[in-house]
């Protein structure tokens, strides 16, 4: 049986869009992806062309997530670099 197609939105913050080479990235819209049900976060990011590193933090629908989280239809992924200031 074929896996169902799902839609996922990926939003990039802290310059990840520029690091990944997205010169026309719209932070209000993010990146919309159509992919297979059950795909893991790491594969979503690779498929989208998002450059990842050990410092990047990920959230799925507002909850912190790791690379092995399975995605569902309608999920929104937020990718952020650590911020510092003071």
Language-model features, listed with the residues they occupy:
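Ubiquitin-like/PB1-type beta-grasp interaction modules and other compact soluble beta-rich domains
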Residues: 1-85
